[in-house]
């Protein structure tokens, strides 16, 4: 349930951490082996939560990312779409709509970026590290859900910036 059915997004890093912690504590009350589960090789396998803090793409250079990821067939248009989509992620949060052109690349992009990280190319690996959080949050935002529980914003008008 934790890994396949529950997803969470927040614009506040601490709120996302607390949500993940609360989910793990609630689950550990029902399953004492939650934190000691191992794979076939005996390695600890804690649950992988899908609770993310939305990250902005401010400061990322499309040119630099495209240059380092081009040898791995990561398209410049895909990088541009990711960077532009999440430029104001902390402001708009889950209101962000993932463009259809980007949705078509989201299925293979994590595997490609994992291969980039294993390639040994230091600059390409750093570019993949910069792009991976954006890909993960785009995947969650592109999904369709049967039920959504949302928290209304608490911001008063005097704190709203010009984008809102």
Where do the model's predicted regions map?
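SAM-dependent methyltransferase catalytic region
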Residues: 1-164
């Amino acid at each position: 349930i934790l890994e396949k059915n529950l997803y969470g997004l927040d614009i506040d890093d601490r709120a996302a951490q607390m949500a993940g912690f609360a989910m793990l504590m609630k689950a550990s009350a029902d399953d004492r082996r939650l934190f000691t589960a191992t794979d076939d090789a005996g390695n600890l396998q804690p649950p992988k939560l899908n609770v993310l803090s939305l990250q902005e793409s401010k400061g990322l250079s499309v040119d630099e990312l495209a240059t380092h990821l081009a040898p791995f067939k990561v398209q410049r248009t895909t990088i541009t779409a990711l960077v532009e989509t999440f430029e104001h992620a902390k402001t708009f949060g889950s209101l962000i709509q993932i463009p259809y052109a980007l949705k078509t690349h989201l299925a293979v992009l994590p595997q490609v970026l994992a291969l980039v990280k294993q390639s040994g190319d230091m600059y390409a690996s750093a570019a993949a590290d910069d792009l991976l959080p954006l890909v993960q949050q785009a995947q969650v935002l592109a999904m369709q859900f049967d039920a959504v529980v949302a928290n209304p914003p608490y911001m008063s008008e005097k704190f709203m910036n010009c984008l809102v």
